[in-house]
C-alpha cells in the first residue's frame, strides 16, 4: 500500500464502494421507465439549483485563478448556469437513448437443444478519477444510472466545491425515487489519498476510468490494481495531402486548434505535404497568428513561414519533444512531410491514438490514411473536434478510450456494460 495512503482511508473508500455495490444491485433490476424518470428528475433538479452550483463553482474558479491555473484548465473548470443547463439537457438526452441493459447481443441453439444467449449487463461499480471537469460529474452520473451502474468519483481539489454542490442536488432525487444516494458518491474528502485508495480497491471497484492530462492517466494505468479503461491524452494530428482543398483546410484547422484549446480532441500538430507547403503554410500561419497561436515548426516550415512577413507571428523551432507533446494551449507543431507514407509513420509514432484528420480529395490517399492510422477515430475533411460522445449521439460520454480492449473511442451507454452468457436447457447433461 502507498505510504501516502493510510489504512483508515483505504477502509473508508472500500466501505463506500461496497455501499455503492449494494445499491447497484437494486438499480440493476430497475426497468428502463424507472431509470428514465429518475434521469428527468435529476435534470429538472439541476436546472432548479443551477445558481447554487454556479456559486460553488465561482469559489473554485477564484481559488484556481489565485493558484495560477492556466486558461485552458480554467475553461474546463467553469460550470456556470448556462453550462449547468447544457449538462441538464444532456441528462435528458440520455433518458431518450435506448437502454443497453438486457440487450441480446447474440443467441443460438446448440445441437443438443441448449439455448445460449449473450446479454448486456451493467459492469457494477465504476470508479472515475478526473480533474477540473465538473461537467463530468453530471455526465458520468447520468450514464452510470441509465446503464445500471454505481459511480464512485474523485473529481479533484480544483472542482471540489462544484462537485459537492452537484452531488448534493443528485442525492435527494435518488432517494425520492426509491434508490439509495450511495449510487453516486465522491471520495474527494480524502484528497489524493482517495484516488490512491480507489486504485488499490480491487474487488470493491469493478473498473476504473481516468480522465484528464497525460500525467494523471499514466499514473492510474501504472499504479492501479483495479482494471482500467485508459482514456487518452490527445496529441491530435491533421495532415494536409497534396490533393487537399486548401481553402477548406484553413477553417478546419482553426476550428480544431482554437475553438477549445484545453480539450483532448483539439488539434496539436499539423503535417503538410511538400508539394503544397510553399502555397499553404503562409496562409495557415497567418490565420493561426491572428488567433494568437504559437507555432513550433521544423526547419522547412520555419524557412517558408519566416519568409512571409506575417504580422504578430510567434514562430519557433520545434524540438523532438514537441512532436510528442499535448499542448492544451494556443500552440501548434507544424512539419512538412515528403509523402503520405511519411505522414502516416510520423502520426503512428507520435500520436496518443486519439483522433487524426486528413484533408484530401484523392480517394486512394484517403483510403490508405483511414486504414493505416492506428487511432480510435479518423476523420476525413473535417475538424477533430467532432470526437465527442455528445456529437456521436451518445448524449454524454464516460471518456474517449484510446485502448483496444473492451472499448475504443467515445464511450457511451453500451460501452458501460459487459456481457453475460445465459444457457436455457431442458435437462441436458454433457456426455
UniProtKB/Swiss-Prot annotation:
The keyword Oxidoreductase belongs to this UniProt entry's keyword annotation: yes
GO cellular component terms, A-Z: cytoplasm
Listed GO MF terms: glutamate-5-semialdehyde dehydrogenase activity; NADP binding
Location of this chain's protein in the cell: Cytoplasm
InterPro entries: Ald_DH/histidinol_DH, Ald_DH_C, Ald_DH_N, Aldehyde_DH_dom, G-glutamylP_reductase_CS, Glu-5-SA_DH, GPR_dom
Keywords on record: Amino-acid biosynthesis, Cytoplasm, NADP, Oxidoreductase, Proline biosynthesis
Pathway note: Amino-acid biosynthesis; L-proline biosynthesis; L-glutamate 5-semialdehyde from L-glutamate: step 2/2
EC number of the protein: 1.2.1.41
Keyword Amino-acid biosynthesis attached: yes
Pfam families, A to Z: Aldedh
GO biological process, one term: L-proline biosynthetic process
Annotated catalysed reactions: L-glutamate 5-semialdehyde + phosphate + NADP(+) = L-glutamyl 5-phosphate + NADPH + H(+)
Domain of life of the native organism: Bacteria
Main localization of the protein described in the UniProt heading: cytoplasm
Family matches, as NCBIfam families: PRK00197.1, proA
Protein family according to the UniProt entry: Belongs to the gamma-glutamyl phosphate reductase family.
Record-linked HAMAP family: ProA
Function text: Catalyzes the NADPH-dependent reduction of L-glutamate 5-phosphate into L-glutamate 5-semialdehyde and phosphate. The product spontaneously undergoes cyclization to form 1-pyrroline-5-carboxylate.
Protein name as annotated: Gamma-glutamyl phosphate reductase
Species assigned in the record: Bifidobacterium longum subsp. infantis (strain ATCC 15697 / DSM 20088 / JCM 1222 / NCTC 11817 / S12)
Record gene name: proA
Amino acid at each position: 500500500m502507498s505510504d501516502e495512503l493510510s489504512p483508515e482511508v483505504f477502509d473508508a473508500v472500500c466501505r463506500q464502494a461496497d455501499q455503492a455495490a449494494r445499491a447497484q444491485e437494486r438499480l440493476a433490476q430497475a426497468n428502463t421507465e424507472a431509470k428514465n424518470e429518475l434521469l428527468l428528475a435529476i435534470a429538472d433538479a439541476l436546472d432548479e439549483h443551477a445558481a447554487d452550483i454556479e456559486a460553488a463553482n465561482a469559489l473554485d474558479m477564484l481559488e484556481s485563478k489565485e493558484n495560477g491555473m492556466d486558461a485552458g484548465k480554467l475553461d474546463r473548470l467553469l460550470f456556470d448556469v448556462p453550462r449547468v443547463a447544457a449538462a441538464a439537457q444532456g441528462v435528458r438526452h440520455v433518458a431518450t437513448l435506448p437502454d443497453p441493459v438486457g440487450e441480446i447481443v447474440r443467441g443460438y441453439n446448440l445441437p443438443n437443444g441448449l439455448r445460449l444467449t449473450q446479454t448486456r449487463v451493467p459492469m457494477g461499480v465504476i470508479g472515475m478519477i478526473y480533474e477540473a471537469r465538473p461537467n463530468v460529474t453530471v455526465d458520468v452520473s447520468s450514464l452510470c444510472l441509465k446503464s445500471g451502474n454505481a459511480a464512485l468519483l474523485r473529481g479533484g481539489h480544483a472542482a471540489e466545491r462544484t462537485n459537492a454542490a452537484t452531488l448534493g442536488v443528485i442525492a435527494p432525487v435518488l432517494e425520492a425515487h426509491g434508490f439509495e444516494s450511495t449510487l453516486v458518491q465522491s471520495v474527494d474528502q480524502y484528497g489524493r489519498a482517495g484516488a490512491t485508495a480507489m486504485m488499490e480497491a480491487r474487488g470493491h471497484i469493478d473498473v476504473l476510468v481516468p480522465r484528464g492530462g497525460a500525467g494523471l492517466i499514466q499514473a492510474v494505468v501504472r499504479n492501479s490494481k483495479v482494471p482500467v479503461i485508459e482514456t487518452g491524452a490527445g496529441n491530435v494530428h491533421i495532415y494536409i495531402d497534396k490533393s487537399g482543398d486548401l481553402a477548406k483546410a484553413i477553417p478546419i484547422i482553426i476550428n480544431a486548434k482554437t475553438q477549445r484549446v484545453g480539450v483532448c480532441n483539439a488539434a496539436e500538430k499539423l503535417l503538410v505535404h511538400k508539394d503544397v507547403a510553399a502555397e499553404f503554410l503562409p496562409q495557415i500561419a497567418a490565420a493561426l497568428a491572428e488567433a494568437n497561436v504559437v507555432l513550433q515548426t521544423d526547419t522547412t516550415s520555419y524557412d517558408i513561414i519566416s519568409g512571409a512577413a506575417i504580422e504578430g507571428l510567434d514562430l519557433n523551432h520545434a524540438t523532438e519533444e514537441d512532436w510528442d507533446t499535448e499542448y492544451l494551449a494556443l500552440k501548434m507543431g507544424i512539419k512538412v512531410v515528403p509523402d503520405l507514407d511519411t505522414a502516416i509513420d510520423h502520426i503512428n509514432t507520435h500520436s496518443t491514438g486519439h483522433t487524426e484528420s486528413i484533408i484530401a480529395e484523392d480517394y486512394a490517399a484517403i483510403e490508405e490514411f483511414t486504414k493505416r492510422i492506428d487511432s480510435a477515430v479518423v476523420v476525413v475533411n473535417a475538424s477533430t473536434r467532432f470526437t465527442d460522445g455528445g456529437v456521436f449521439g451518445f448524449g454524454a460520454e464516460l471518456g474517449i478510450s484510446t485502448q483496444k480492449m473492451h472499448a475504443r473511442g467515445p464511450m457511451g451507454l453500451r460501452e458501460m456494460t459487459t456481457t453475460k452468457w445465459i444457457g436455457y436447457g431442458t435437462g441436458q447433461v454433457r456426455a
